[in-house]
């Protein structure tokens, strides 16, 4: 893969670091999501030399989907924070918002495109970009969301930050016994506890 377009599932990658990275600022604020995202993105850029980096952010798409199906994502467990103390629990939501705001601002100073489409989940935006805008371009989707496996084809791969590996259509077929073109249909029959 030479100079692919890299499309990052912003909140998915941020939350991995927010929950796992206990980094603190000099003021005592938790900054693990911010620090981990920036460091991780730097490593990915070194490894894949993308021609373009796009970060897709969530913007309330869940509300739209929940109006159609109230149980949408109701099976999700709350984020498990890797902390050595419990004092930050009431401030977690505020800190999360603060870190995302700092991250968006920092990324706006870099040669990175950020996309936020009103009433759309990042997954939907990523799917549109990979299938329609960059369909004839090599792409790497950065996310641990298996729903995005449906986008994997000859031109598109998925990098899983948790597994630290690039996933292609052969890897999906080998692991699940399902082609990427049938992955979503199979998940409909099997079910998805995270949704």
Q: Across the structure, where does each feature detected by a protein language model lie?
A:
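Noncatalytic, basic helical substrate-engagement surface that gates or grips nucleic-acid strands
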Residues: 2-140, 148-166
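Generic structural marker for isolated residues within well-ordered, non-membrane alpha-helices
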Residues: 41, 169, 183
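Helix-hairpin-helix
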Residues: 144, 182-195
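Surface-exposed, charge/polar-rich loops and edge strands
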Residues: 172
